[in-house]
Design a protein with these regions (language model features):
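C-terminal beta-strand-rich structural cap/linker in extracellular carbohydrate-active enzymes
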Residues: 199-226
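Loop/helix patches that line or flank the sugar-binding groove of alpha-linked glycan CAZymes
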Residues: 1-202, 214-215
């Protein structure tokens, strides 16, 4: 989310593997993704709320910005709300300026964003945003499956935020529409060029014994033959 009190970003709170998994879900969802500047390369700088209004309007904006957090337990004390950066202060703006050299420093996640955005643009399923052609299911307490389709084309996103999972394909009702078809993996956050460890999800076995294995903190996309 953007505009948190101190501008902290999701990747400031979780490790790189989980951030790659969460980013995969965001960028393959049936909606236009809202990206806050710098999140595509895991910027170290905060995403603060800053403004440049005339003095009186600026004073009201600063006051309103701090008052909007008064309902949060962490900011019940007015003195704590005063620690929220002033949107009108130049220092707030300067703290949010991106360091574009971090694109190279965090090349893996930057390439992941580029690759998934290209997939959204060119893939015949992901380029459509109709939610009626999407089914999302919690497959485990920490793994989500997203089945998207368009015409005879099917895509399956498995996003595992937790420990490694071996999932029986035929025993899972959420996979009924794709379980008997050939699966072809077209994306994996484990890809080394994307900052991954090279341990990719895979489908093993056939028929009722078919199992999909998803390593810890990994996401993958499969093209399912129609």
């Amino acid at each position: 989310m953007g505009n948190r009190p101190f501008g902290d970003r999701l990747h400031h709170e979780i490790n790189e593997d989980r951030y790659a998994v969460a980013s995969t879900l965001l960028l393959t969802a049936p909606e236009t993704p809202l990206l806050f500047m710098g999140q595509e390369f895991a910027a170290s700088t905060p995403f603060l709320y800053f403004t440049d209004h005339p003095e009186e309007l600026g004073r009201l904006v600063t006051q309103g910005r701090r008052e909007e957090f008064s309902g949060f337990r962490a900011f019940h004390d007015p003195s704590l709300r005063e620690t929220i950066p002033d949107p009108q202060a130049e220092s707030t703006f300067l703290a949010s300026k991106l360091d574009l050299t971090e694109r190279a420093l965090n090349a893996g996640i930057y390439e992941l964003y580029r690759e998934l955005l290209a997939l959204r643009s060119h893939d015949e399923v992901f380029q459509h945003n109709e939610r009626s052609h999407t089914r999302a299911t919690a497959l485990t307490a920490q793994m989500i499956g997203v089945h998207r389709w368009w015409g005879n084309e099917h895509r399956l996103v498995l996003a595992n935020l937790g420990p490694a999972v071996s999932l029986p394909v035929f025993a899972n009702p959420a996979l009924a529409a794709v379980r008997a078809r050939p699966w072809h993996r077209i994306f994996s956050t484990a890809e080394p060029r994307l900052g991954g460890n090279g341990r990719h999800p895979e489908v093993v076995g056939a028929g009722p014994s078919r199992v999909v294995y998803v390593p810890a903190r990994t996401a993958a996309i499969w093209r399912i033959e129609g």
